[in-house]
Structures are given as C-alpha cells and as structure tokens.
Amino acid sequence: MVDFEYSIPTRIFFGKDKINVLGRELKKYGSKVLIVYGGGSIKRNGIYDKAVSILEKNSIKFYELAGVEPNPRVTTVEKGVKICRENGVEVVLAIGGGSAIDCAKVIAAACEYDGNPWDIVLDGSKIKRVLPIASILTIAATGSEMDTWAVINNMDTNEKLIAAHPDMAPKFSILDPTYTYTVPTNQTAAGTADIMSHIFEVYFSNTKTAYLQDRMAEALLRTCIKYGGIALEKPDDYEARANLMWASSLAINGLLTYGKDTNWSVHLMEHELSAYYDITHGVGLAILTPNWMEYILNNDTVYKFVEYGVNVWGIDKEKNHYDIAHQAIQKTRDYFVNVLGLPSRLRDVGIEEEKLDIMAKESVKLTGGTIGNLRPVNASEVLQIFKKSV
C-alpha cells in the first residue's frame, strides 16, 4: 500500500425526508443561494417545491439557473457566474445529478476568479477560492455529490475536461433514495454503468498490495450487479435505490483510491466521445469498457482479471487463467447489454469511424501521451479500442 493523506470532508445526510435539514445547513454558509438544476424533472416530482418551501421558511433568498445540459457546458457556467456576481450569492445549491452538481462546482469556483471560467478548467491552479457548494442528489451515477471533481464541455473547441480543487467538494449532500424512483430506466442503466466504471478505473491498478481497497471495490461492483437490474424492474425498490446511491458516492470519493497508484483510462476515452457527439456518458463507458479490458489483457495483467472474475463474478478459480479472464469480460459485456439494456456498439449511438483518430489523439493529449495504470495505452492503441467498439 502506498502512502496517502485521507480527507473526505462532505457531510452526508442519507435517507428518507433528509431534505428537512436543508435550511439549517445552508444557513451555516450564507443566506443568498443560487439553485442549479437541469431540465425540470425536479419540478414534476415535487423536489423543487419542497426545497423552495424550506428556503422560504428559513428566509433564505434564492436565485435560479435552470436548463443545465446532460454534458454541462462552460457557457452555462458563465450564466451562473453572472447571476452570482450580480446578486451577491453566497452558496451554490445543486439539485439533480452529476451534470447539475458539476456545473454548480465550476460556477462556485469561477465566481472567485477574475477571468474566463474555462481558464480554471484548463488549469486548476488558478482556483484560489470556491463558494460553498451543497447538493441534493436525484440520480445515482457520477459521485459528484462527494468528490472534488467536475467535468465541463466546451462546444466551441470540442473539449470535455476535468476541473478539480479540494474546496469543490460539497459542504454537504442530501441523499434520499426515494428521489431516484422516477429516474427513467435508460438513465438508471447508464448511471449504474458509470458507477461501475469509476470502480474499474481504480481497481485495475498495478498496485498489488492494496488488499483492503480491492476487496471494497469488489463489494461495490457486486452491489451494482445485484441492484442495477432490480432498480430497472422495480423502480420504487428502496433497497435497490439506496444501495446504488451509496455505491455512487463511495465509488469515487477517494476511499478506493487511497493507498493505490491509479491513472484513469476509459473515462478519458469516453470524454472525447461525448465532447464530439454529446452522447450519454454512462452509455459510452459501457460500450468501451469490455473492449478496453480485452485490449489490455496479457500475461502481465491476467492476474487482475482472474481476481475480478473469481471475486466479483464467482467464476471457478481452478479454471485456466485466460479462460477466467475472458469469461469475466464477457459477463461484464452481457451485464451492460442484457441486464441494463445499454448499446454495445458506438454505431448504435451515431458514432462511426470518421473522427476516431482525432479523438484518440485528444484522449492522451493532457496526460503525457498515455492513459491507464495496469497497462497504459497510447493514442494508436486507443484508436484500436475505438475501432473494436464501432
């Protein structure tokens, strides 16, 4: 296990009706709030009305930024920054999933930066101060409710990049599993794939001495595998929704990463797909992941796929190691396609070979020419993975 510093500062209020703490907690940080949300589902399901009622009862003045895109755009961030500056906003509250939360995070950071918000996405060292952030989660997927990251799109440059700062972790997040009952099946499926991908990114590491972290990762993967299908069949199954929601947070809040050397790969590949084609993030991950697994499988990496196959999928450990590895990868593909109902090919979401080369090059541009940890891949290898996925 490698050395690490531990800090997961976000306070979590988990369970039914935990929204009732909203007023009390917000007032710790200010009395002027910007509410950031997406396409209006929170108004249809009553979450918006409940939140606004609480703010009004607590004499908290609020402003709104609606219409955050599924792949949030820097132009939307700019709108939020303008609202905050014109009204002296003190706290940014996201209500929604990862898109709303990520947008809120960059707004909170950009408010304190005298320049173009895209600057702080390109260079996180320019972030010096961040307005307090809070979130009410409505979908289990990105884990933004408990991490320090945000992913933002620039449609002018076809870039989808990560902004990060320790103070971008929400001060608190409210996780009520009942708020995910009305999430459409396609979003539940894509969200489950996203959670699993976050785990894969840190699980498939060449740190062989992180026994504890790997066993926790396997438990979270088994949780997703068990409850993803149940949530699709029974959208109001509380235990399924609760387990997926908490798995979302634990998958990416650092718990699985501390003590390991990690370097993400599939996410950076997928960011190029959704930067150029604006596809659903979790769908792109589900398509790429099995093909990436097959590509990096070799004599040096097979041991990790054996661990994965035996401990996550229950494959007989006495089998040939490569048989276990291939079976585990196939089970992963089958789960994404047959249980979650996600597409299996890039062409299914409108991506052909036209831009694969440029996307492959862009995926490694900011990482020294390679991505990944267990077996790093370069641009030409990413291109091969893309081609296998078409």
Swiss-Prot record:
Keywords: NAD, Oxidoreductase. Pfam families: ADH_Fe_C, Fe-ADH. Pathway: Alcohol metabolism; butanol biosynthesis. It is an enzyme of class 1 (oxidoreductase). The keyword Plastid does not apply. Its EC number is 1.1.1.-. PROSITE patterns: ADH_IRON_1, ADH_IRON_2, AMP_BINDING. The gene is bdhB. InterPro entries: ADH_Fe/GldA, ADH_Fe_C, ADH_Fe_CS, BDH-like. Homodimer. This is NADH-dependent butanol dehydrogenase B. Belongs to the iron-containing alcohol dehydrogenase family. One of its GO terms (biological process) is 1-butanol biosynthetic process. GO terms for molecular function: alcohol dehydrogenase (NADP+) activity; butanol dehydrogenase (NAD+) activity; metal ion binding; methylglyoxal reductase (NADPH) (acetol producing) activity. The keyword Nucleotide-binding does not apply. Primarily NADH-dependent, although some NADPH-dependent activity was observed. Transmembrane segments: none annotated. GO terms for cellular component: cytosol.
